[in-house]
A protein has these predicted regions:
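Compact integral membrane and secretory-pathway proteins
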Residues: 1-150
Length: 150
């Protein structure tokens, strides 16, 4: 297995940035309540699970792109990542609109999670649109003419 960071295109890098945003958002305050700030872990629910799955999908997309020698796995990872990214965007919007337990206002973590979900979706979509097979070495060397023929 050879790792080549040159294979990572703009789409994979955008999705990776989105995954980092989602992961960081999990440890930042999401809501401000009269009793203090609440983060993703204290308001844990299905939306947080979906955000974590989308971040894992974006990481899988990036790792598949830089480690695989063919386009098959990165393309399928991109397709799944688009689906997970779309679901994560909807989940993040729900978490922005539906505040738990008397939360007065939103904090940076909720907005960072939303931005990360949008970046994952946009990056995965761009990854699917960018078809450059020249980034991958051919599986077989090109056929050579028999000796004596040109």
């Amino acid at each position: 297995m050879r790792i080549s960071l040159r294979r990572a295109r703009a789409g994979e890098l955008i999705a990776l940035a989105g995954a980092v945003c989602v992961i960081v958002s999990l440890f930042e305050p999401w809501y401000q309540t009269p009793s203090g700030n609440r983060d993703a872990w204290s308001t844990f629910g299905p939306a947080v699970v979906l955000l974590i799955l989308a971040a894992a999908g974006a990481l899988a997309l990036f790792l598949a792109t830089i480690t695989e020698h063919s386009t098959a796995l990165p393309v399928s990872a991109g397709v799944w990542c688009v689906l997970l990214g779309l679901i994560a965007v909807v989940a993040a919007i729900v978490r922005l609109l539906e505040r738990p337990d008397h939360a007065g206002s939103l904090c940076a973590g909720a907005w960072l999670a939303f931005a990360g979900a949008v970046l994952i979706l946009a990056g995965a979509w761009q990854s699917m649109r960018d078809e450059r097979p020249s980034l991958y070495e051919p599986a077989l060397p090109p056929a050579q003419p028999p000796p004596g023929q040109s």
